[in-house]
Design a protein with these regions (language model features):
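Residues that define the loop-to-transmembrane-helix transition and helix capping
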Residues: 193-194, 224, 237, 290, ...
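Hydrophobic secondary-structure segments that place a key small or acidic residue at a functional site
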Residues: 29-36, 48-60, 66-133, 140
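Transmembrane alpha-helical interface segments in multi-pass membrane proteins
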Residues: 209, 216-218, 223-270, 294-306, ...
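Short juxtamembrane loops and helix-capping segments at transmembrane helix boundaries
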Residues: 266-293
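Peri-transmembrane interface segments
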Residues: 153-208, 218-220, 229, 237
Length: 325
């Protein structure tokens, strides 16, 4: 957000070899202005505000970012005070519902004419206005914060990067947009990951204690059964193995219930501060196949460790003592 690129430089970048053209021959790229504004959040304490990122974009923004789609309303008309809002903030801030108006700055009102989605990315927590509207409102005439463009193919990225990065006149750094936002969200992701691990460790420890307590109770109730099996010739290892397997399957059953409950979180949106841009970001949790299988594996391990000591106690039980009850 702190970078400044002159409009003349934008034209040089878009004229570079490898930039993709649309059906009219115009380059699929544009300069963008990025500014953070404070806006009153609905449902919070009166007067409480949160930071919202406003992005000044070109008329071809939906062509530059084909993964962004309108889910309500229409695209803004060029040269008007109209804007789009991401579905993550639409209706959650004063004046940001479809058809409402809010001020970018004092006496700079804009009207929300459309709501867009962007595959769950941070774009869904932004306001998009015409770049000239943003420049005028925030005093950025003749300047942009960044340049976003599409290339003919991903294979041309290295050549384009070398062409732009080595140009001393431009003095710019080229990055994939996904890479840039991954770097921007590292602080937030690290915080969420750290909190998640702390909660997971405590929950795992509690789950193992619960499994251990359950299996100790099961061993005590089935003491005669264990003695009978030992008298019939079943080895200590067979007894131990059977109780560990039982504990593991019980843990897996609990894990499946937990996974079912966690999948419901995909329908819940959470808001928090991005520590790099200081904007409020709205997101939802996505359960990937690897995460689901990893969770089940962790549940199985908790069942194994939680059931081992009770199983060991059962295996060491004397057949005669067990038969006496």
């Amino acid at each position: 957000m702190s970078s400044s690129i002159e409009s003349a430089t934008v034209s040089l970048i878009l004229a570079a070899p490898g930039v993709k053209k649309d059906e009219t021959g115009a380059p699929l790229g544009a300069g963008e202005v990025v500014v953070v504004i404070a806006q009153e959040k609905l449902g919070a304490e009166p007067g409480q505000v949160s930071n919202i990122l406003v992005r000044g974009v070109g008329e071809n923004v939906l062509k530059i970012r084909p993964d962004v789609h309108l889910v309500a309303g229409r695209a803004p008309k060029p040269g008007t005070g109209e804007c789009l809002v991401g579905k993550g903030i639409a209706g959650n801030f004063r004046g940001m519902a479809l058809g409402e108006k809010f001020e970018l700055k004092k006496n700079r009102p804009v009207e929300v004419v459309g709501v867009f989605e962007a595959g769950g990315s941070s774009f869904e927590s932004e306001v998009w206005v015409n770049i000239e509207t943003a420049r005028t409102a925030f005093g950025r005439e003749g300047m942009v914060s960044s340049v976003t463009l599409r290339l003919d193919s991903a294979a041309k990225l290295d050549a384009f990067k070398a062409n732009v990065s080595t140009d001393k006149q431009l003095q710019l750094e080229v990055k994939r947009e996904t890479t840039y936002y991954e770097e921007q969200s590292q602080g937030t992701a690290l915080f969420i990951s750290g909190m998640g691990w702390v909660v997971s460790v405590f929950c795992a420890f509690g789950a193992m204690l619960g499994a251990m307590n359950t299996m100790f109770a099961a061993v005590a109730q089935r003491k005669r059964e264990v003695g009978t099996l030992r008298a019939l010739g079943f080895s200590k290892f067979a007894i131990l193995f059977s109780f560990v397997v039982e504990s593991t399957f019980l843990a897996l059953a609990g894990g499946l219930v937990g996974l079912g409950a966690s999948l419901l979180l995909s329908f819940v949106r959470v808001s928090m501060m991005n520590f790099s841009t200081w904007q409020e970001v709205s997101f939802s949790f996505a359960a990937t196949p690897s995460l689901l299988f990893g969770s089940l594996a962790a549940g199985a391990l908790m069942g194994i460790f939680g059931g081992f000591l009770p199983a060991l106690k059962a295996a060491r039980t004397s057949p005669i003592e067990a038969m006496r009850g």
